[in-house]
């Protein structure tokens, strides 16, 4: 802990105590008042929260604090997610003596050895990190209402979740059946993103299997994502060095890689008959089940036994890897299948040659493959003549009948339609099948086991594939605010592909499924509408309502308004006035105004949040906004336990102090961007905050009570502009932009002001107090300290947003004065030995107003000589939008008065005495004939040496 961080920590402790004493963050509903209800994703207490969590929570906290300044009643609560396997997996690892996990927890999280020994108990581990994370949030200065805190294994919460699931079941959205799921072979249970290392969502894809067979009936099931190309197969590929197995699967003897046999065993009965190296099968001939053609099996070391079945069909006309490999073997035979605009008959050959690819090991083949596959899928059409290749091995009339089917549904069709047709037809014809796989492999369970796909027979699912439900979800996405806006497309895409999702398992902490013993609701399914629970748990506890009283009728009334307090009281035993109070509390806070989380939760939690809200709640209670922030890196690298570069939030607060840490997480990247947290940047921000503190102390000690001058008015006007830009940034959730305005741009204005005046005025103190309010969402402890030393009443956290108004005359005067200073400095005669600077001002400001139109005649009509009129128009054209806007807003402007008011400021900037004259004053001396060249905004300047 440095001296600087120690100062900020002590400052924070002081003001956090005062906030707690004033119960600032424990709001009560105020009927009729505007409100702002924000939540951020509650953490799993399977470890200490880190600066990545801190960033998400900071953004929510910044919004909460800003909206409080805007006069709204603000609620920002927090809970803890005990459900699922993350906690259980770590506890099991510690209990089994896993040295790696134990060492990580001691080194990264600073857990003492005597505490580690107790963490084999999952609830002890969860409570330990629950309390540690809560302390970290408090030290970080998050304005959380802890009176609403809960865990997801609290009995009240479990009753709430059971009600939610009964509602989904009533609406036909929970089903039981057969479906592929991500699966941990070790724990024998479905897994989702929160059950995996690095929270990686298992992406389940489907291979089409095409059953090529040799003369002995041994099937070689080629796994492909492009079954429409089966008509162009010229050979098969097998890795000669890989381990393969002959298996019995679905009544067939098949050759697949040993790894594929293991994966297939979770999708049907698999019996391994024998194992062999791939080279045993090289050189055989197998028959294409669609064309009847016999093709050879070649060896290829590029075949990955962990992908598909380890058996690959080769289509060199349309697959760059196949073309390059066969070219190396001098065995190329091309069969054209797909017409693509901009390509010839053989797209793979064309692209390989265009890119100068020389061999099958060239890395550029990856790019070539992407180009060909994308072009064929998006623009490709199946050739009409492919029909002639179908069923050559069949006798009549079967051959003609099959070709007629292909002519109708395959030939001349877009590739995507042909693919859909042939995928179904192969299975229906019994010459193909389906294999599911993890397409973003490897994905590992938190226990370290690689995830596979299992087809479950009697699993409970939430049916996110239901069409009407998807439409409601899309409607909400289109209506609500999403930050960043470009994430809206990601949500819509997720809604499109979401299908049935396993919602219960037989292992882990959590809520029992209410209608089926032995099942526990999984962690991404019990965390979709808990924001509503925050609004009622405080009263449930306050009134002493028991979990067994929280029956269906209670929740129906509180959340949906079903029934009357009197009717529900009879069923629950809860007094009517208490029921009414709880209902009113929910009604005041809901809908949720902002849901904050990391962008990695868009494909799961955040989209489930949307689905479940539209399923459970009426439209007026649907959430209004989602904020999905980017990740946090550390010194350019992803944080991970294996790299030992995870920075726990409480440790970061101790290293830098809460406000410097908040400033760094706010200012380093805009919300949607990934943030690279760097030590040097955090130190720089700490020093910037310290300089702001020193500036405020100087103001408090030196400000004098005097009539405001032009510089004072300019300061207030500039700060008013900074605050307005900050307000707009906060409103739009542009947290970095707001932080730049309040921590750097405002400081720069004050620095310039203090460098230009002998002593600051009381008006400057008022401006600094306004600045403290705008700074408070980012650096609340420093803002309180500044507010206090500058005489602010009460706590700045409760202060209304300042109403400073910019004075356009004061702003124009300062811009004009600085422009004149620059003009003087650009004159070649300016430099060493200047005795005085004489300035001649043209008083015809009306010419400048007229010149805004860009019309020379308008300036002449305002009284300017023609030659001068053209020059004034040219001058005005060079001005920026801001200066033109000020000129438009200011009716009259006296350049001589502005220069005279800033005389001391200008003489200090120029390092020489200055004299000011009106150019039309006949008594003024005409030094260097500069009077006649003076124009509005461009005075005549004489330099005497």
Swiss-Prot record:
One of its GO terms (cellular component) is cytoplasm. A motif ('HIGH' region) lies at residues 43-53. It is an enzyme of class 6 (ligase). The keyword Transcription does not apply. GO terms for molecular function: aminoacyl-tRNA deacylase activity; ATP binding; leucine-tRNA ligase activity. GO terms for biological process: leucyl-tRNA aminoacylation. This is Leucine--tRNA ligase.
């Amino acid at each position: 802990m440095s001296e600087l961080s120690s100062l900020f920590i002590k400052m924070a402790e002081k003001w956090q105590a005062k906030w707690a004493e004033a119960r600032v963050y424990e709001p009560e509903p105020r009927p009729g008042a505007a409100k702002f209800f924000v939540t951020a994703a509650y953490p799993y207490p399977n470890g200490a929260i880190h600066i990545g969590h801190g960033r998400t929570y900071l953004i929510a906290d910044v919004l909460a604090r800003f909206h409080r300044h805007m006069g709204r009643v603000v609620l920002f609560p927090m809970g803890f997610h005990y459900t699922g396997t993350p906690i259980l997996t770590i506890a099991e690892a510690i209990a089994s003596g896993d040295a790696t996990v134990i060492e990580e927890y001691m080194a990264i999280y600073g857990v003492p050895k005597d505490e580690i020994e107790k963490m084999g108990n999952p609830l002890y581990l969860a409570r330990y990190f629950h309390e540690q994370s809560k302390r970290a949030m408090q030290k970080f200065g998050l304005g959380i209402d802890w009176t609403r805190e809960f865990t997801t294994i609290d009995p009240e919460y479990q009753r709430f979740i059971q009600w939610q699931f009964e509602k989904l079941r009533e609406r036909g959205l929970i089903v039981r059946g057969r479906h592929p799921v991500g699966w941990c072979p070790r724990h024998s249970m479905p897994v989702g993103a929160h059950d995996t290392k690095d929270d990686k969502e298992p992406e389940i894809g489907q291979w089409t299997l095409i059953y090529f067979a040799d003369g002995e009936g041994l099937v070689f099931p080629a796994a492909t994502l492009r079954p429409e190309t089966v008509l162009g197969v010229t050979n098969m590929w097998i890795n000669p060095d890989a381990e393969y197995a002959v298996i019995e699967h679905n009544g067939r003897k098949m050759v697949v890689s040993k790894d594929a046999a293991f994966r297939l065993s979770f999708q049907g009965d698999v019996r391994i008959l024998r194992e062999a190296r791939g080279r045993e099968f090289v050189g055989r001939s197998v028959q294409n089940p669609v064309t009847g053609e016999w093709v050879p099996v070649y060896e290829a070391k590029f075949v990955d036994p962990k992908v598909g079945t380890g058996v690959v069909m080769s289509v060199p006309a349309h697959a760059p890897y196949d073309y390059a490999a066969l070219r190396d073997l001098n065995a190329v035979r091309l069969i054209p299948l797909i017409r693509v605009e901009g390509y010839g008959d053989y797209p793979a050959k064309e692209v390989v040659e265009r890119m100068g690819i020389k061999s099958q090991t060239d890395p550029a083949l990856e790019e070539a493959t992407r180009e060909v596959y994308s072009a064929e899928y998006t623009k490709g059409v199946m050739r009409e003549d492919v029909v002639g290749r179908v069923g050559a091995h069949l006798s009549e009339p079967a051959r003609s009948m099959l070709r007629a089917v292909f002519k109708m549904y395959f030939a001349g069709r877009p590739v995507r339609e042909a693919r859909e047709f042939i995928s179904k037809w192969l299975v229906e014809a019994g010459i193909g099948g389906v294999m599911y796989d993890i397409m973003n492999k490897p994905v590992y369970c938190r226990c370290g086991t690689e995830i596979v796909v299992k087809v479950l027979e009697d699993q409970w699912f939430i049916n996110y594939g239901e069409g009407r439900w998807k439409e409601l979800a899309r409607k909400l996405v289109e209506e609500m605010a999403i930050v960043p806006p470009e994430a809206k497309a990601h949500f819509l895409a997720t809604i499109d592909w979401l299908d049935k999702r396993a919602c219960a398992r037989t292992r882990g902490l959590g809520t029992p499924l209410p209608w089926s013993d032995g099942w526990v609701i999984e962690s991404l399914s019990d965390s979709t509408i808990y924001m509503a629970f925050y609004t009622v748990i405080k009263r449930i506890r306050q009134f002493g309502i028991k979990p067994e009283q929280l029956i269906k009728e209670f929740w129906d009334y509180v959340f949906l308004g079903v029934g009357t307090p009197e009717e529900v009281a009879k069923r629950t035993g809860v007094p009517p006035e208490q029921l009414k109070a709880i209902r009113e509390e929910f009604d005041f806070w809901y809908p949720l105004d902002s849901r904050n989380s990391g962008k990695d939760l868009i494909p799961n939690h955040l989209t489930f949040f949307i689905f479940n809200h539209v399923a459970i709640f009426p439209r007026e209670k649907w959430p209004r906004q989602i904020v999905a922030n980017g990740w946090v890196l550390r010194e350019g690298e992803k944080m991970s336990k294996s790299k030992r570069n995870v920075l726990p939030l409480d440790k970061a607060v101790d290293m830098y102090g809460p406000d410097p840490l908040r400033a760094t997480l706010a200012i380093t990247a805009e919300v949607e961007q990934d943030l690279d947290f760097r030590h040097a940047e955090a130190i720089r921000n700490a020093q910037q905050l310290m300089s702001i503190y020193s500036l405020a102390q100087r103001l408090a000690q030196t400000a004098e009570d005097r009539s405001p001058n032009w510089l004072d008015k300019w300061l207030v006007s500039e700060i008013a502009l900074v605050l307005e830009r900050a307000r707009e940034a906060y409103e739009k959730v542009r947290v970095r932009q707001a932080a730049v305005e309040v921590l750097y741009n405002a400081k720069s204005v004050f620095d310039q002001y203090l460098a230009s005046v002998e002593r600051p005025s009381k008006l400057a103190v008022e401006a600094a107090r306004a600045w403290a309010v705008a700074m408070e969402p980012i650096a609340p402890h420093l803002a309180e300290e500044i507010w206090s030393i500058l005489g602010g009443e009460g706590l700045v956290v409760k202060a209304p947003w300042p109403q400073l108004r910019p004075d356009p005359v004061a702003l124009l005067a300062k811009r004009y004065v600085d422009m004149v200073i620059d003009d003087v400095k650009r004159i070649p005669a300016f430099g060493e030995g200047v005795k005085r600077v004489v300035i001649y001002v043209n008083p015809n400001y009306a010419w400048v107003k007229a010149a805004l139109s860009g019309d020379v005649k308008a300036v002449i009509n305002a009284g300017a000589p023609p030659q001068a009129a053209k020059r004034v128009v040219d001058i005005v054209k060079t001005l920026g939008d801001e200066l033109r806007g000020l000129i438009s807003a200011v009716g009259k402007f006296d350049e001589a008065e502005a220069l005279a008011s800033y005389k001391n400021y200008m003489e200090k900037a120029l390092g020489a005495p200055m004299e000011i004259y009106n150019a039309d004053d006949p008594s003024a001396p005409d030094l260097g004939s500069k009077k006649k060249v003076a124009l509005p905004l461009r005075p005549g300047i004489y330099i005497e040496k």
